[in-house]
Design a protein with these regions (language model features):
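Catalytic cores and adjacent flexible loops of soluble metabolic enzymes
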Residues: 1-206
């Protein structure tokens, strides 16, 4: 949930697309209602404190923190992190290169946290993934093309008997022209990814 003016200049070459892609309060409420009807949990990244207050009114169960927020790139990064921390709810955090995990842990000292390995390239070249580092995290923010990296991460973590594994993947509708469309998978690929993960979950590695 973000406001285009907070994150981008109006001179950005994709400004019109970015502006149309804002997740407003009204849109968030609609998605929450649809998610509830499907029995799915709704949560999201939010980039300004008022957004946290609104999501609290929707009774979300957890929050996501984007890597750019951890890097304090945006006008309200610190205030937004503090607002999320004050809810006491679980937090999922994408740790981009340069993020201080100790600093973020201090902010969320009273929250249950899940840290995700993340390289903020769009798309991310598969060969840039440092698997030794990635497997130190319980989550993976996957910006590669396709679903191979997510499947590998899940398999490796399952082999290590990890009790909690989180995968983040950008998903788009067919012919979507959103700002992250070029690095997102379509619904059929999401279904394929979930199917692979469910098989891995049932696997025995000991």
């Amino acid at each position: 949930m973000w406001r285009a003016n907070d994150l981008y200049s109006t001179t950005h070459p994709q400004w019109n697309v970015i502006k149309k892609s804002e997740l407003t309060f009204e849109k968030a409420a609609q998605i929450k209602k649809i998610s509830d009807g499907l029995g799915m949990e709704f949560f999201c990244s939010v980039f300004y404190p008022e957004g946290v207050e609104f999501l609290e009114s929707l009774k979300v169960k957890r929050y996501k923190v984007a890597s750019r927020t951890c890097l304090f790139k945006d006008p309200y990064s610190f205030e937004t992190l503090e607002a999320k921390a004050k809810t006491g709810k679980p937090i999922i955090i994408s740790m981009g290169i340069g993020c201080s995990q100790e600093k973020i842990k201090k902010i969320f000292s009273r929250n249950r946290t899940t840290f995700c390995y993340c390289i903020s390239d769009y798309p991310l070249n598969f060969n840039k993934i440092n698997w030794k580092q990635a497997l130190k995290f319980n989550g993976f923010s996957d910006h590669t093309l396709g679903i191979t990296a997510s499947i590998l991460f899940t398999s490796f973590k399952k082999q290590k008997n990890s009790s909690s594994i989180f995968i983040e993947k950008h998903v788009k509708l067919t012919n979507s022209k959103g700002p992250d469309a070029s690095t997102s998978i379509e619904i059929n690929k999401l279904k394929e990814l979930v199917s692979h993960i469910r098989i891995i979950e049932k696997g025995r590695f000991t």
